[in-house]
């Protein structure tokens, strides 16, 4: 209404002589008061024919705000990744094999630039904070519900017993919860899901189907049980041949992914002797099956602890691979091992020999014996030598529990 009154008034004023010669001062005051509300209206300009009589201050400057831009960009990328996963699932239902779509170098570099080591150390310290007694049940119950943890298998089922998250993650199981299979040569060292298994060919190991990593990059230069390095491998095949110590044997591998809800300890998969430990400081990227399918040589990028030695058929190794929030890898008999430490730089490795003048063999391990633990879910990689008639009794993607058979002769 105020706008229409203003236009009428302006129309009357158009082409009229100056106000002081035709209007009484009282009329001027009344007209001014009637136009006063127009100053508060959200319009940019009023025009009388071609003349502009009022212009509001323009506020069109665009302010760049990093956080909204990052949220929009990250959300769009996450949405795209979810669409790709949905598309892959639909194609798998149709029985179509989908070639893996690998991350580019810039994507891997961008991911590695995230301070996952620092974040994992912070997470580790947070896990050590003692929870109030009244808060333990709701916090642990939420975790149990989210990741499907079976507390009936725990040695201590009372949630109030666990003072902090770290103790809860590393909970022990009842002895009868995981019977160890005595009929097979190699058992699963942990709970988890089988990502891949089979024979090592051309010095390339499959982390998932169609995505490989270099055997030499993963294990590092060969070290023998006497802690003396072999000469550098002249070719990929010669490095593989260094690991195979007996004629007629082949090299095999098995990759087991531990989800956050799985039992976090790992055990000896067979009777063997550990003679050497190699620690690779590295990134702590996620190792879930989706990432393993997306990033080539993921396990070579991440921090890991390689235990090597011998079993009755020759070379045997177990590697614990770290992941996001899983910088802490503990080996029970190795007190000198400290993972995800700021003093360790990426791109190097640290060796330690368990063979000494007083112990010429190393550390003997029995099948099923406690070997180590993660602070959260991660990955175990077995690489070992065995006769050609060794058979895995597995399916890719199957769930497996510690103590169940992996394979036998």
From Swiss-Prot:
Catalytic activity: a 1,2-diacyl-sn-glycero-3-phospho-L-serine + H(+) = a 1,2-diacyl-sn-glycero-3-phosphoethanolamine + CO2
Top class in the EC scheme: lyase
Family named by the database record: Belongs to the phosphatidylserine decarboxylase family. PSD-B subfamily. Eukaryotic type I sub-subfamily.
Protein name as catalogued: Phosphatidylserine decarboxylase proenzyme, mitochondrial
Mitochondrial intermembrane side: 83-409
Cofactor note: Binds 1 pyruvoyl group covalently per subunit.
Native species: Homo sapiens
Record: disease: Liberfarb syndrome: An autosomal recessive multisystem disorder affecting the eye, ear, bone, and brain development. Clinical features include early-onset retinal degeneration, congenital cataracts, sensorineural hearing loss, microcephaly, intellectual disability, white matter changes, mild facial dysmorphism, and skeletal dysplasia with platyspondyly, scoliosis and short stature.
PTM annotation (Pyruvic acid (Ser)): residues: 378
Highest rank taxon of the organism: Eukaryota
Transmembrane portions of the chain: 64-82
Pathway assignment: Phospholipid metabolism; phosphatidylethanolamine biosynthesis
Effect noted on mutating residue 277 to Q: In LIBF; loss of autocatalytic processing; decreased protein abundance; decreased phosphatidylserine decarboxylase activity; changed mitochondrion organization
Gene of this entry: PISD
Site (Cleavage (non-hydrolytic)): 377-378
